Amino acid sequence: MKKNELKPAVVFEQFAKINEIPRPSKREEKMIEYLKNWGESRGLGTKVDETGNVIIRKPATKGYEHLKTVILQSHMDMVCDKLVDVEFDFDRDPIKTYIDGEWLTAEGTTLGADDGIGCAI
């Protein structure tokens, strides 16, 4: 399997973009800005509250307005851990991913899928 074959493609394409953004705990400013711009560029109601939560509202699809609201939530930061012999700056460097058998993994660092994939959805 190749990275461009991962499904759903739109989620993994977004996850790849997110992995370009440094987002250590307590230093999520770049991720906040990315999500804010993403929502605003699509004309969605977007705001950042006083603690840095990004709230993006999308109206219901036509014909589904009568259904209950769905809320998706995920955190923006990631666990910053690396192998001892790997040089990596979590404040600057992008996460480099690759396929290992059936798994998407990272080169010498944590993957950031907790919860980068949640943000990608």
Pin down the residues of each PLM region:
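Predominant activation on well-ordered alpha-helical scaffold segments within soluble catalytic domains
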Residues: F12, A16, K36, C119-A120
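N-terminal capping segment at the start of a domain
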Residues: K2-K26
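Short glycine-centered, acidic/aromatic-flanked micro-motifs in structured strand/loop junctions
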Residues: I21-R23, K58, S74, G108
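Structural signal for hydrophobic packing residues in well-ordered secondary-structure cores
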Residues: A16-N19, G39, G43, C80
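A non-catalytic alpha/beta surface segment that caps or lines the substrate-entry region
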Residues: P24-K68
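Active-site metal-coordination/substrate-binding segment of hydrolases
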Residues: Y64-I121
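Residue-level recognition of alpha-helix initiation/capping sites
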Residues: A9, E29-K30, A113, A120
